[in-house]
Regions:
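Secretory-pathway/luminal and periplasmic proteins that interact with or process carbohydrate-rich
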Residues: 59-62, 134-142
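Active-site nucleophile and cofactor-binding loops and adjacent substrate-binding regions
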Residues: 98-103, 125-128, 146-159
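Glycine/charged-rich beta-loop-alpha catalytic/anionic-binding loops adjacent to active sites
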Residues: 86-95, 138-149
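Acidic, glycine-rich active-site loops and adjacent beta-strand->loop/helix elements
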Residues: 113, 128-138
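Terminal-appendage/accessory-domain detector
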Residues: 1-99
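Alpha-helical support elements that line or immediately flank enzyme active sites
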Residues: 34-41, 102-122, 160-171
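Conserved small/polar residues in nucleotide/adenosyl-binding loops
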Residues: 176-182
């Protein structure tokens, strides 16, 4: 069994009802903090340029860009722009297990896909928590790996948690999601 298959099996086996209430409360807190970071970064010139580029090249779609009332992009571009805005002021959360910024990658992803798929708030939060779990597990696995300057675990590991979280919201979670990161 490949590592990707093991990760998907782990995700499928998770029972959200076993997640302690404190985890949900902390997840809501980190989620709200990340949305605040996105709002703080939304007006920065680099974000405006990214929004303009995405609108010009892909047009309107189903997912909102926070801070831009009338702008909707495809879920991938909305997640990208919102993630850029979340990190641009560098106030985003820090995961000690990942040694990176999980929420910066996950919140924009689950918001964009959740809006596209018309998911409930609970479904979005569950996908976010699962993404955090995946990033934390993978972060611990590579914790002692030497990372070259210019790279960090947010970009190297965060894609896996974000892919899993998006896959959960696109439903159903299965081995078909394995190809999403390839």
């Amino acid at each position: 069994m490949t590592l990707s298959e093991k990760i998907v099996d782990y995700v499928i086996s998770l029972n959200k009802k076993e997640i302690p209430e404190m985890v949900y409360l902390k997840a809501q807190e980190h989620f709200q903090d990340t949305v605040a970071c996105i709002m703080a970064g939304a007006g920065k010139e680099a974000i405006r340029l990214a929004v303009d580029y995405c609108v010009e090249t892909t047009g309107s779609n189903a997912s909102s860009v926070i801070g831009y009332k009338d702008v909707k992009l495809n879920s991938g571009n909305a997640a990208m722009v919102n993630a850029m805005a979340a990190h641009i002021c560098d106030y985003d959360d820090m995961s000690m297990e990942l040694n990176g910024h999980s929420s910066t990658v996950l919140v924009p992803t689950v918001l964009a896909v959740g809006e596209e798929m018309q998911c409930s708030g609970t479904e979005i939060l569950d996908a976010y928590i699962t993404g955090i779990q995946i990033n934390s597990v993978l972060g611990r696995l590579v914790a002692n790996t030497k990372i070259d300057p210019g790279w960090n675990l947010t970009s190297l590991v965060g894609i896996f948690g974000a892919t899993i979280a998006a896959g959960i919201l696109y439903k159903p979670v299965s081995y078909t999601h394995l190809r999403a990161h390839e």
